[in-house]
Structures are given as C-alpha cells and as structure tokens.
Amino acid sequence: MNNSKSIFISGGAAGIGREVALKFRDAGWTVGAYDIDEQGLELLKEQYPDIITGRLDVTDYESWEQALADFTSHTGGKLDVLDNNAGIIGDHDVAEQASGLIAKQIEINCTGITFGARAAHRYLKNTKGSHMVSMGSASGIYGQPHITPYSASKFYVHGFTQAMSLEWRKDKIRVVNIMPLWVKTKLADVEAASTKRLGVRIKTEDVADAVWKSVHPKNWFERQRQDYSVSFPDLALRLAARFSPAPVARQFNKIIAG
C-alpha cells in the first residue's frame, strides 16, 4: 500500500489542475489527475509517468464513482485532498450566449463539484485531516456582467463551500475555496471588461501555491479559514465587498466590470 498523502484533481490535464498536480507530485504526494481531455492526460502521463490519470466527466455521477474507485485502489482507500478544479467559462451577454453553453457552465461548475463531493465523501471521511478544495473565483464575490452564468456559478461554489464546511464538520473534513482573479490560462481568453481593466497577471503556479497553503494550515486560526485569495487585487475585492456599504461596493464593481 502507498503510504504517501494523496490528492485527486478534476480537470487535471491542463491549466491550474495540471499545475496543482505537479506541485503536489514534487512534494512526494500520490497524485491523480482526471479529466475529460484524454489528449491532455496522455501528454501529462508521458511526461510524468508516476501521476495516475484517468477519464472523468464531472457531470456524470457514475464517472466520478469509477474514477475515485480507480484512484483510491492505489492509496488503500484513503484520500487526503479532493481538488474540485474542473470548470468552464462562456463570455458575451446572456442574451447572446448559446443556451447549451449556459447549461454546460452550470452542469460543470455547479453540478460537477457537488457530484464530486458526494462521491468522494466516504474516502475523505476515512482519512484523518482530509480536505475538499473547490476552485472558486473573485467573480463569485460580486456579479460580473458579460460572463454572467460563470460568475453566478462561482457564487454557487462560495455558498457550497460555506454549507459543506458545516455539513462535514462532524466528519472532520475541512472545506475551502480558492478565489483568484483572472489566471493565465485558456479560461481567461474571454471578452470580459474586467480582464482588460485588471489584466491577467496571476500565474497557474500562484494558484497551485494557494491550494497547497489551503491544505496545510499552520494553526487553529488558519484552520477556521474558508476562502483563499491568490493576489492582492482579489483580496481587496473580497474585503471591499464584505466591509463596504452596498452602494460603494456596487460602484467599485461597476468600475471593474465596465
């Protein structure tokens, strides 16, 4: 049986998921990168044969069951971290987005993480000090126009994190949410005004570092933390939304969103 710590990553073939996989692999963890992008998985496996890979459609519950059973067969049934990373974005106003794309964003970004939590629960519960990490976004702090379904889906991630943190408290599973602004991945190739005003400065390595930090709390106070910013601008946005009067926060968001 493998005695190293383990992490299962959805959407692990490219972008942030791939970077998280490499970060934890380099630290000696048993890493599972699962994705619907089989070509990306083949490339990852070719470059890093020790990373466990497999197909995962996050909108299909049976796919989750099969992928987790496959991965945990390498870990003795243990799972230290579930990284709910898979997500997609569509740009343009709601009236101009294809209905299928709108539905797909909700299915992957919302249903996907919920299925992941349900399927992984028994493995996380069976592992002392386990974590579930979900990939949120600063666009889940205040609604962002032109990427509205995506932004709304990240509000779901935020609320899901809060609720699951309470629901799983009895099982001693810690639940956290990573909330970056725009990251240098294909996901940022959208026509949102906020990408132009704020720029795309965060690297995938920065997000991977935040994921690592989130599952390694150093003290009691850090263990109470749920939301993790990645850069100063997204921290400022989160604090402004939390502590500013609603009209001020709205005006600030209007400036960002254009």
Language model segments and positions:
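Conserved NAD(P)H cofactor-binding loop of Rossmann-fold oxidoreductase domains
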Residues: N85-G90
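Active-site helix of classical SDR
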Residues: A117, S153
